[in-house]
């Protein structure tokens, strides 16, 4: 048993339509809500900080996704019947998908895929643990992007790019803690 996890991509796999019905998500367990929400956040953040292939459209989709996730993930986690939060999370996930479909993802997903293949770690859980570490490791290269995300989410609107970037990473860790995910 080789224990590999592979991504498959083909234009024939792209649906023509997507139905985003929040009622279909209300029965999701809290753990699944938390980890799939963090996976969507990872898609958006990785798309936003990548230098390869990003453009105004992918950045706009990533920004919209990050803002919606910061505003709604904890609400959806705490009250699975909150259809407004659930709908916002569906739209955020969709927008994050549009963003990373154009740009790709980065080291967080590379590591998370390996962990899933080797250790059967839930993908979103691996992302939750790894994302803050990888974002810190990227250092100053991503401070401007993370600073902007801190500003638009209201995490931190004053200070240097480094201070805002670090506050954004800390906010991700706090979100994880509040949903019972390891940090």
Residue map of PLM features:
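Short, functionally important structural connectors and interaction interfaces within domains
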Residues: 5-6, 11-12, 16, 20, ...
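Amphipathic alpha-helical segments in well-ordered regions
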Residues: 44, 48, 72, 114, ...
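Amphipathic alpha-helical interaction segments
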Residues: 60-64, 88-91, 110-113, 129, ...
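Gly/Pro-rich interdomain helix-loop hinge
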Residues: 118-183
